Amino acid sequence: MAKHAPIFPNVQGFLHGGDYNPDQWLAYPDVLEQDVQLMREAKWNVVSLGIFSWVSLEPEEGLFTFEWLDEAIERLTHAGVRILLATPSGARPAWLSAKYPEVLRVGPDGRRNRHGGRHNHCYTSPIYREKVRIINRKLAERYAHHPGVIGWHVSNEYGGECHCPLCQEAFREWLKRKYKTLDALNHAWWTPFWSHTYTDWSQIESPMPHGETSIHGLNLDWKRFVTDQTVDFCRHEIEPLKQVNPNLPVTTNFMGTYPGLNYWRFRDVLDVISWDSYPRWHAHETLVPEAVHTAMVHDLNRSILKKPFLLMESTPSVTNWQAVSKQKRPGVHVLVSLQAVAHGADSVQYFQWRKSRGSYEKFHGAVVDHVGHANTRVFRDVQAVGEMLERLAPMAGAEVKADAAVIFDWENRWALEDAKGPRNIGMHYEETVVNHYAALWRMGVPMDVIDEEQPLDGYKLVVAPMLYMVRPGVAERMKAFVERGGSLVLTYWSGIVDENDLVFLGGFPGPLRELAGVWAEEIDALYDGERVPVRVADGNPLGLAGHYEARELCEVVHLEGAEPIAVYGADYYEGMPAATVHRVGKGKVYYVAARLEDAFLRDFFARVAAEAGVARAIERELPDGVSAMVRSGDGVEYVMLMNFTPEAREVALDEAEYKPLYGEAPTDGAVRLPAYGVSVLERPARNG
């Protein structure tokens, strides 16, 4: 398997750097000179430059002052530091708000915002779009062919929504294109409920707390519109950049699993995916809960374009906006940086280079503290990451080959979380996906994280927790996948509604019923603290043994061709299936009918993955809290072992021939990882 081409032409190895804001320090020329030398010491080779610099670039309408940016780019380029040049739309100048108040966002309460904050602008506003086009064009004409500029960092952390008259009209036009007629819209939204039928397009407004929120189809389409409008704004930003230099890659930085935007919709406008990672490290006894969730989001971002991504932001130490600003313990910064690389990142980048003297983020972590020199623990941690990335440079571009995929779907999440019932104190969609992902993560199984519309070719195992919404074509793709020999895991509360959030008629799980071989008659919601015992079925096909517990949600299902794996041990559904398997063609469909404890998921997925022939990073059991990942390319595989606990762990290796590259080396067929320790090993590719 060949490696991917470099993300940025003529840039080999990993990128190491982060946000750099020289415009905050123009009155301190000695600081700007020190920055370059300190970057060399920190082993930085890239900066994101100019992210919030609009007023420094255009202090008055039509007056452009690029001289400070010219100097910064020349100084960085001379030092060998490459530049991801930002477009500054994330925070507009006060003169723009004052002269053109229509660019200011209107909140869901119907009130127009004042100037302030950031991303407080309307994506629909023609004036704002024109002003963004002008500044982006100016930047492109001046810098798009500069040898030090390797790509565009478009805006920053898109998010939010606007309810102004311009957006209301744009939403209505979006709906007209989608539904063509009001009759079609009224049927799709089921508006006769509570006499909410629309008789004129002008009656439709965005969901607002003091207005309409009870039509779930409206709520769902509004979220789709907000995503489409944001993607269109992003495309509008990119156009003048690509007109000047079509070969310069573009990206924008995502925010984890931010609920406001469906990030899959950006895949057609971006050349590379990047995201900002800020877990609450040390919030639990071990780092494992945060490590699992972070790993899943890394995999999601890699899966969007199926190639390496950029870790655009992380903190070398702390944030200042979380409830507790907990410092990373010694060794943790290298550990979590390697985790990003292990899951497919070709960069480790930070916010921010130097701590600001004032305003909102003056206490946010940075490489250079207010003390202003390199003699700090955090600076040394950053140096250590730079040294690691230099040693691992041949790994850049290597593939993460996944036999398994877990479905995390934004539209499914929107609909599921908007539904009233069966458990309004928490359906926990994202947590449920993470729990299923975690069972495979603990086994060292590389995974893609995809939405429900992605092709399933090439996978051996697909896990689809709580697939409440099943859009057209999804059931058919799943059936074809299973018939070819794939293993599919479905759960309770799946196949409930269609793409319009209309309930399927004829029995659940709707279009997945025949495939699953079960009929879900009803679902029982439990109060917090309630538990229902579950026991394995005698002679069950997976060979499971023992007893487990279910919590929160228990479906009452009837077998329609499936075989029981486990059954309920109490309540009115005692003896009925709690987990099943249905053989379809050459494959199998598993249906987990209750929210079962982690112990069940571990035992269940260990057997399901083995039967499906899913490859693991190493073919050995991993100690608790240790993660194993593998990247491959050009005939070799890079295995990364990471200990997310504060105690030492010993990892037994399989029979492959391992060569140490970084961290702990193998001894007598095992690697001993200290607390928060890592090991990177090279072995010949399993398949040549």
Swiss-Prot record:
Belongs to the glycosyl hydrolase 42 family. Keywords: Glycosidase, Hydrolase, Metal-binding, Zinc. It catalyses: Hydrolysis of terminal non-reducing beta-D-galactose residues in beta-D-galactosides. Ca(2+), Mg(2+) and EDTA have little effect on enzyme activity at 1-10 mM. Zn(2+) at 3, 5, 7 or 10 mM inhibits activity by 20%, 30%, 40% and 65%, respectively. Has potential use in hydrolyzing lactose in neutral pH dairy products such as whole milk or whey. Also could be used in milk lactose hydrolysis during pasteurization at high temperatures. Coiled coil: none annotated. This is Beta-galactosidase BglY. Optimum temperature is 70 degrees Celsius. Retains 90% of activity when heated at 70 degrees Celsius for 30 minutes. Approximately 48% of lactose in milk is hydrolyzed following treatment with enzyme at 65 degrees Celsius over 60 minutes. One of its GO terms (molecular function) is beta-galactosidase activity.
